[in-house]
């Protein structure tokens, strides 16, 4: 089997993952005619507007339960849809090791993007420090949205640097 790149989008509910994914699937710089499997682990297919996708090559599949994330289940989806790349909108309440251990061996995380609401992130980091750190540890890119003039960017940057030692 060929290696399959996985674009992993992590962050808490309301952070803007769905909108970001919707926009990249409408972007000619990202999209090709290759089939994409979009695994939606938070929300539902109705959160997306396929008519805005650049191509009609996106297959959406909802994963409602973390227990469903198994190598067998994901392999079945791959065999059924034969994608060339995979996008995962990951549930912010689920721990990342669940998806890492569930990915078939030939799947690899090509890019891990953490999207965070700059207004809610400090509250989440205090209320759920381990879960917040889990989302940041392996992130290749951390995007803070909804920033305002009053946003204390240095506080957000300090938290990311503390947790994500590779960045």
Where in this protein do the model-derived segments appear?
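Flexible active-site lid/hinge loop adjacent to a nucleotide/diphosphate
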Residues: 121-136
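Long, charged, low-complexity intrinsically disordered regions
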Residues: 2-6, 160-167
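G-domain G4 guanine-recognition motif of GTPases
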Residues: 11-12, 41-42, 115-119, 139-159, ...
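Short, aromatic/basic amphipathic alpha-helical patches
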Residues: 49-56, 154-163
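Arginine/glycine-rich "motif VI" loop of SF2 helicases in the C-terminal RecA-like domain
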Residues: 107, 135, 165
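Nucleotide-state-sensitive switch-loop elements of NTP-binding domains
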Residues: 2-10, 14-15, 19-124
């Amino acid at each position: 089997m060929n290696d399959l790149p996985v674009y992993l989008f992590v962050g808490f509910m309301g952070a803007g993952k769905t909108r970001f994914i919707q926009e990249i699937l409408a972007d000619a710089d990202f999209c090709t005619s290759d089939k994409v499997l979009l695994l939606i682990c938070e929300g539902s297919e109705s959160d997306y507007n396929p008519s805005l996708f650049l191509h009609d090559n996106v297959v959406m599949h909802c994963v409602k339960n973390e227990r469903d994330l198994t190598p067998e289940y994901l392999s079945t989806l791959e065999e059924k849809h034969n994608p060339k790349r995979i996008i995962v909108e990951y549930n912010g309440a689920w721990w990342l090791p669940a998806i890492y251990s569930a990915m078939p061996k030939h799947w690899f995380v090509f890019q891990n993007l953490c999207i965070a609401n700059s207004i809610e992130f400090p509250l989440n980091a205090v209320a759920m420090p381990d879960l917040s750190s889990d989302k940041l540890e392996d992130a290749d890119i951390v995007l803070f949205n909804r920033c305002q003039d009053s946003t204390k960017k240095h506080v957000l940057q300090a938290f990311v640097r503390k947790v994500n030692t590779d960045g």
